[in-house]
């Protein structure tokens, strides 16, 4: 889809004009102008009750006298001054649904006149594009009959505001990153294994002059002492690979980088502590942390942000086997701490603890890890907010600000010293689980033992990384949050 922002005349020929109307006869400037061009036809529709402004209600008019546009699509925007981001996205989805039923190739949107509560025109345009791209997403790679695609090619926003071009640029890059994350995450685990993740990282680096790649294989991990990471991989014939993408684009090439670390369990059966069969297929999504880091790196490369950023995809697979690690094993991690394994299904933190130690070599400005880490986080927060744990208030607040800006929501969980008590082991420095209570927090507390040398935050996306049911599939979260956080670091 090609997106543009420019002033257009209502008399201009096009396939379709999209116009918003509020409830209680609150009309926009363009509504009144079109009403004059059509000799009061729109007001007649209002008086007859056909046009009410009810949220997401649409009416499609064709070949109106006085308009060169083939169609006029009017959409209800609810009460003026009360339109939220969520409602606005419903409006865009309603517009798309109606347009899909026509052969519309070009649209001129006057929804730029619609006011979002506490938002400016930049967000009006950015939310529109991101919603369009997210709604139009299809993953039919393995279907013999492909999904019907929209014929819509051009979407023009009626404005010449300077912010509009920036909104289009940001939205295009973030949407591209989200799509990349969704595509990788939706791949079946017989194809998307750690080697496949590394191959995708290689392709991304080869297609960007600003990105470079280093792949750490099991032999190098063994030399580095990444025994916790390697233990998780022992039950699988698919070897572990940790892909390290480097984006070195700050004016000062030696500036400390921001590091993103993504959990990349391409399939998690739980190992010897085997998961129940129900919904186990969804454990292909246990690499959504790595997928979101991949998508974020793609987005910032497209935006050419003047930052130094490193993205780590910690690829691994957790399966039961005669060689698999066991409950009761004691592992020596890369930083020297020992961990007693009480549950092999608490494997993500074992992979991450060594990855978090590995990135110390970059002397990072800060580190954010992203992981589908705990079912406890889903129980606590549901499927709307990612869980945030951090030892740094400024970093946590910056991430929450980005979450609010993008509506890629997050909620901060506490991380006080008491939670470390639950991780005590009689045989090792730490246990890999902390008991029944506060599981999302104790998982974060476990990771905090490996982040003493830098500012750190942890995002648990177990509830937000994918959807179940009829709309089953990866969401691409939190690419939007992470990219916005990085955009904000430039300001």
From Swiss-Prot:
Enzyme class: hydrolase
Binding positions for Mn(2+) 1 per the UniProt entry: 268, 345, 347
Cofactor note: Binds 2 manganese ions per subunit.
Sequence similarity: Belongs to the peptidase M17 family.
A Pfam family per the record: Peptidase_M17_N
Names of the cofactor(s): Mn(2+)
NCBIfam families per the UniProt record, alphabetical: PRK00913.1-2, PRK00913.1-4, PRK00913.2-4, PRK00913.3-5
EC number, as in UniProt: 3.4.11.1, 3.4.11.10
Residues annotated as catalytic: 275, 349
Gene Ontology MF annotations: manganese ion binding; metalloaminopeptidase activity
Matches recorded under InterPro entries: Leucine_aapep/pepB (IPR011356), Macro_dom-like (IPR043472), Peptidase_M17_C (IPR000819), Peptidase_M17_leu_NH2_pept (IPR023042), Peptidase_M17_N (IPR008283)
Protein's name according to its UniProt entry: Probable cytosol aminopeptidase
Keywords: Aminopeptidase, Cytoplasm, Hydrolase, Manganese, Metal-binding, Protease
Annotated function: Presumably involved in the processing and regular turnover of intracellular proteins. Catalyzes the removal of unsubstituted N-terminal amino acids from various peptides.
An individual GO BP term: proteolysis
Species of origin: Haemophilus influenzae (strain PittEE)
């Amino acid at each position: 889809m090609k997106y543009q922002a420019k002033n257009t005349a209502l008399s201009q020929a096009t396939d379709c004009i999209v116009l918003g109307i509020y409830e209680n006869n609150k009309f926009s400037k363009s509504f009144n102008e079109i009403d004059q061009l059509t000799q009061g036809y729109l007001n007649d529709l209002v008086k007859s009750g056909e046009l009410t402004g009810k949220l997401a209600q649409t009416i499609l008019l064709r070949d109106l006298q006085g308009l060169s546009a083939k169609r006029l699509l009017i959409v209800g925007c609810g009460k003026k001054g009360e339109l939220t981001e969520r409602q606005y996205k419903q409006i865009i989805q309603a517009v798309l649904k109606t347009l899909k039923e026509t052969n519309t190739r070009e649209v001129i949107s006057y929804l730029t006149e619609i006011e979002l509560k506490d938002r400016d025109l930049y967000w009006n345009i950015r939310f529109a594009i991101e919603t369009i791209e997210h709604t139009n997403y299809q993953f039919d790679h393995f279907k013999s009959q492909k999904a019907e695609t929209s014929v819509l090619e051009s979407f023009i926003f009626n404005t010449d505001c300077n912010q509009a071009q920036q909104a289009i640029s940001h939205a295009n890059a973030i949407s591209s990153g989200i799509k990349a994350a969704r595509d990788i995450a939706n791949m079946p685990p017989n194809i998307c294994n750690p080697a496949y993740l590394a191959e995708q990282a290689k392709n991304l680096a080869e297609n960007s002059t600003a990105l470079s790649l280093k792949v750490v294989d099991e032999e190098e991990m063994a030399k580095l002492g990444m025994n916790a990471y390697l233990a998780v991989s022992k039950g699988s014939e698919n070897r572990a690979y940790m892909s390290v993408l480097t984006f070195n684009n700050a004016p000062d090439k030696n500036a400390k980088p921001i590091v993103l670390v993504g959990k990349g369990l391409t399939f998690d059966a739980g190992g010897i502590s085997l998961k129940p069969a129900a919904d186990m297929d969804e454990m292909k999504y246990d690499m959504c942390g790595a997928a979101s880091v991949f998508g974020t790196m793609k987005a910032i490369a497209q935006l050419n942000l003047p930052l130094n950023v490193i993205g780590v995809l910690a690829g691994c697979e957790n399966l039961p086997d005669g060689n698999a690690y066991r409950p009761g094993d004691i592992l020596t991690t890369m930083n020297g701490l020992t961990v007693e394994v009480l549950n092999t299904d608490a494997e993500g933190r074992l992979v991450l603890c060594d990855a978090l130690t590995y990135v110390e070599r970059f002397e990072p400005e800060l580190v954010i890890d992203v992981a589908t880490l705990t079912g406890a986080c889903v129980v606590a927060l549901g499927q709307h907010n990612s869980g945030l744990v951090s030892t740094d208030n400024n970093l946590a607040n910056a991430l929450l600000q980005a979450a609010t800006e993008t509506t890629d929501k997050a909620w901060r969980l506490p991380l006080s010293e008491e939670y470390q008590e639950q991780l005590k082991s009689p045989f090792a420095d730490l246990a890999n689980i902390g008991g029944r209570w506060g599981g999302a927090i104790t998982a974060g507390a476990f990771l905090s033992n490996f982040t003493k040398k830098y500012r750190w935050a942890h995002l648990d996306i177990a509830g937000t990384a994918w959807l179940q049911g009829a709309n089953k599939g990866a969401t691409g979260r939190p690419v939007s949050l992470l990219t916005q956080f990085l955009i904000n670091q430039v300001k």
